[in-house]
Regions:
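Helix-breaking motifs and short loop linkers at transmembrane-helix boundaries and internal kinks
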Residues: 37, 69, 90-96
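Structural signature of the two symmetry-related core transmembrane helices
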Residues: 72-87
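Helix-loop boundary and gating motifs at the non-cytosolic
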Residues: 4-51
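Helix-to-loop junctions at the C-terminal end of transmembrane segments
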Residues: 57-69
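Helix-to-coil boundary motifs at intracellular loop junctions of multi-pass secondary transporters
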Residues: 32-36, 67, 118-123
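MFS transmembrane alpha-helix packing/gate-lining sites
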Residues: 53-57, 107
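Cytoplasmic helix-loop-helix junction between adjacent transmembrane helices
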Residues: 102-125
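Paired small-residue
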Residues: 95-103
Length: 125
């Protein structure tokens, strides 16, 4: 058991870092949207883009993992998540933020699904 955990430390570190960064991003986007005087409805719409992406990503990721493998899917979606965070910083626009949140939802759930299936593949029992 300890041998398997030692082999997977990079995966745990990567997922932990992404969870911390995402938690900060969610808080900062909410605060920034109020400072930019977005309406409450607009804030609700672009913040819900994350959950729409989360739902779609959970349905599409297993097929991608079967086609190209765990490491490639994880790397691609981790990169996409960081790109969407940069887009949100570069463009202060509710439409772009909705797209950014949607991509973040797809990316993070994909990384979570990949890490879980990766650990299940490594499990011996």
């Amino acid at each position: 058991m300890q041998k398997e955990v030692k082999k997977s430390w990079a995966l745990f570190l990567g997922i932990g870092t992404m969870m911390i960064a995402h938690g900060l991003q969610m808080q900062i986007m909410g605060i920034r949207s109020v400072l930019e005087d977005f309406s409450v409805v607009t804030i609700g719409i672009f913040m819900s883009g994350y959950y729409v992406g989360y739902f779609i990503g959970s349905k599409t990721t297993p097929n991608l993992v079967q086609k190209v493998g765990h490491i490639r899917v994880f790397a691609a979606f981790a990169s996409l998540a960081s790109l969407s965070a940069l887009v949100a910083v570069a463009y202060v626009n509710p439409f772009m933020w909705t797209i950014s949140r949607f991509i973040t939802g797809i990316s993070l759930v994909s990384c979570y699904v990949v890490s879980e299936s990766w650990l299940n593949d490594r499990a011996t029992n």
